[in-house]
A protein has these predicted regions:
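A short beta-loop-alpha structural element at the N-terminal edge
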Residues: 11-29, 111, 157-171
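Conserved donor-binding loop and adjoining core beta-sheet/short helix segment
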Residues: 15-19, 29, 35, 43-107, ...
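Conserved acetyl-CoA-binding loop-helix of GNAT-fold acetyltransferases
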Residues: 89-96, 232-238, 242-259, 276, ...
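Conserved GNAT acetyl-CoA-binding A-motif
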Residues: 102-112, 257-270
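Conserved active-site alpha-helix within GNAT-family acetyltransferase domains
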Residues: 113-130, 247, 271-288
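A conserved beta-strand-loop-helix scaffold within acyl/acetyltransferase catalytic domains
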Residues: 46, 76-78, 184-234
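Conserved GNAT-fold acetyl-CoA-binding loop/helix
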Residues: 31-48, 177-195
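Acyl-donor-binding surface of acyltransferase catalytic domains
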Residues: 2-5, 66-70, 77-154, 292
């Protein structure tokens, strides 16, 4: 007979603790079983480990176990975001990881029901937000990618950004942050946007689409693993939208990921136009995802 976590005998065997170096394998095994909705937390842990020294990509992790089996995890990241993969313990883990970290909470991200539960537990339901709401989680096996005809015949060319394009792409990135993430156009937000873009370029995770030698769209990954990538920061200037440029940019970035060995891609969006773009490339809806960014 299968025992539920509410069973007293199961609860007696459960424990909650902060993750430490040495816990990487059990964390990876758990997150891999929820791969599509765990990209931020999984990629950060792989990149920065489980120590916390306020460095980029680091986080303070709290996890609930039953014996040696992980049941859920929350991570309070260096950015202030609480990242969740806690199907049954989101409230408890959100409270615990923030108590461990003592960092300010600047937002939450994860499966939508978990974010709602954690937000209530942290007493943030009435906090002012820049962004909030449920989005659709999409996934694609890269063997099923539908490549746009304009890309295959060379009408649109995609490649890594060049230094002389940085100013243009930085302007696009801040425009993306304002439009999508509720940012304000300020010197601080421009510096932050440029930093994110520069990191994506250095890591080989940004691609620019060109039409008649002029940049027309940007595709990027905001989390990567050897077998799976997550799209984020896709932007086409308003005057150039509706012409298939984003579709070509995204397809080119996914072809590059496939050549590197990735077999799957995920993303989340609530934008109806973006939904049409991704479905045309072969993406299918696999769940939901939510990001709450506090003001």
């Amino acid at each position: 007979m299968t025992q539920h976590v509410d069973d007293p005998s199961v609860q007696a065997a459960m424990n909650l603790r902060r993750l430490q170096p040495g816990d990487e394998a059990v964390l990876e095994a758990f997150l891999a079983s929820h791969a599509d909705s765990s990209m931020f937390i999984r990629a950060n842990a792989r990149r920065a480990g489980l120590s916390y020294n306020a460095e980029p990509y680091q986080a303070v992790y709290a996890a609930r176990f039953h014996g040696d089996r992980m049941l859920g995890v929350a991570a309070h990241a260096w950015t202030g975001l609480v990242l969740l993969q806690a199907p049954e313990h989101a409230a408890e883990l959100a409270r615990t990881c923030t108590e461990f970290s003592r960092l300010p909470v600047r937002g939450l991200a994860g499966p939508a029901a978990q974010v709602r539960e954690a937000r209530a537990a942290l007493k943030l339901d009435d906090a002012p937000t820049a962004v909030e709401g449920d989005e659709v989680l999409f996934a694609l096996d890269l063997s099923d990618l539908v490549v746009p005809e304009a890309l295959t015949r060379g009408a649109i060319v995609c490649r890594a950004p060049r230094p002389e394009e940085r100013d243009t792409l930085c302007a696009w990135r801040i425009a993306y942050d304002v439009e999508t993430l509720g940012a304000t156009d300020s010197p601080e937000s421009r510096q932050r946007a440029a930093g994110f873009l520069d990191a994506q370029i250095v890591d080989g995770n940004a691609w620019v689409a060109l039409h008649e030698d002029a940049p027309v769209s940007l595709s990027a990954f905001n989390a990567t693993l050897p077998d799976i990538v997550q799209l984020g920061g896709i932007y086409t200037p308003p005057a150039l939208r509706g012409r298939g440029f984003a579709r070509c940019a995204v397809a080119a970035s996914l072809l590059a990921a496939r050549e590197r060995g990735a077999s799957r891609a995920v993303l989340f969006t609530g934008n109806p136009n973006a939904v049409r773009t991704y479905e045309a490339l072969g993406f299918a809806r696999v769940g939901d995802y939510s990001i709450v960014l506090l003001r």
